[in-house]
């Protein structure tokens, strides 16, 4: 009799426990579904590696990525109204200028980079080019060089900034215009990574890229002085002398991009279709043992911890991300 009673009580509590488990909030369930990310082309290889690692941890999530120039990525949201969860930019200012406040609330700065002049063994004067003569070689007849579109890709306007700063640094009046005179319009491509294949096939001699892209694609490159490579935040006052005008939020509008050290930014779009899974990816990506480690391994220095400019912005982040971020302008 007692044993039967104990069994019934045990069964009752077992059923209660089962109901309690089944009624747990959805937050305890693993994220699932599709996460759409628009990102800078220079992040393609590290994000490819992150995608594999993240999806192995969360088999129910399908991370779908679209690479483009950063401004082009932002305009997919602002102009084309394409569904998107996450946008990652090679210049955090693109998010500030084009997405905040209408399409995003915050902007996490997660990595840096620097510009280099890439080439291959097939390039003209490959055995001659160095940090002291590159600007002369780019002016030589028959040398084919290019950069990405400044209106679509930060690497494009940064390439122009490097040339402006080089004119000042080397004290060569008119150098900027002289170098550009040897670059036809057809050598400007929508995003910087498109220039990689032109270099590798020998159809282009030199191209401006981020150092991380050069490392990832095993390209040779000329490293530039900190004063002009846009890679050292301590040189921001010097970099600010360079200014490039690019297309703005609306047709016919323009905005000025002022020289500054290369800083990448990432945000969650306000009407993200799958916010839960998107935040799970961001939590993985911003972790020093997760996505930031992949960035570092692929030649791109991450900020550890990542940063936002104000405490107010930090307070608007999802709780899971706040612990991975510091306040630092």
From Swiss-Prot:
This is Uncharacterized solute-binding protein SYNAS_25580. It comes from Syntrophus aciditrophicus (strain SB). It comes from the Bacteria. The keyword Signal applies. InterPro entries: ABC_trnspt_W-bd_WtpA (IPR022498), ModA/WtpA (IPR050682). The keyword Signal applies. Keywords: Signal. Belongs to the bacterial solute-binding protein 1 family. WtpA subfamily. Residues 1-29 form the signal peptide. Coiled coil: none annotated. One of its GO terms (molecular function) is tungstate binding. One of its GO terms (biological process) is molybdate ion transport. Gene3D superfamilies: Periplasmic binding protein-like II (3.40.190.10).
């Amino acid at each position: 009799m007692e044993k039967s009673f104990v069994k019934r009580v045990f069964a009752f509590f077992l059923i209660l426990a089962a109901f309690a488990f089944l009624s747990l909030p959805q937050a305890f369930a693993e994220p699932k579904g599709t996460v759409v990310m628009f990102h800078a082309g220079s992040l393609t290889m590290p994000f490819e590696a992150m995608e594999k690692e993240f999806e192995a941890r969360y088999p129910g999530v399908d991370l779908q990525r679209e690479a483009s120039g950063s401004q082009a990525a932002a305009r997919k949201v602002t102009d084309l109204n394409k569904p998107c969860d996450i946008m990652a930019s090679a210049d955090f200012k693109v998010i500030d200028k084009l997405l905040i406040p209408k399409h995003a609330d915050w902007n996490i700065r997660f990595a840096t980079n620097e510009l280099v002049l890439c080439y291959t063994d097939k390039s003209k004067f490959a055995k001659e080019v160095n940090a002291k003569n590159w600007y002369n070689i780019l002016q030589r007849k028959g040398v084919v060089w290019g950069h990405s579109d400044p209106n679509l890709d930060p690497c494009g306007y940064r390439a122009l900034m490097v040339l402006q700063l080089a004119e000042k640094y080397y004290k060569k009046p008119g150098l900027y215009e002289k170098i550009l005179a040897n670059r036809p319009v057809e050598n400007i491509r929508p995003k910087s990574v498109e220039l990689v294949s032109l270099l590798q096939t020998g159809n282009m001699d030199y191209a401006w890229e981020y150092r991380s892209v050069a490392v990832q694609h095993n390209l040779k490159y000329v490293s530039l002085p900190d004063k002009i490579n846009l890679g050292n935040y301590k040189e921001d006052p010097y970099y600010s002398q360079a200014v490039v005008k690019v297309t703005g939020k609306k047709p016919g509008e323009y905005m000025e991009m002022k020289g500054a050290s290369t800083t990448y930014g990432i945000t969650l779009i306000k009407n993200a279709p799958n916010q839960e899974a998107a935040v799970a990816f961001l939590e993985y990506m911003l972790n020093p043992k997760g996505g930031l480690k992949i960035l570092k391994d692929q030649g791109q220095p991450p900020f550890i911890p990542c940063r936002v400019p104000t405490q107010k912005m930090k307070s608007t982040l999802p709780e899971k991300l706040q612990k991975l971020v510091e306040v630092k302008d």
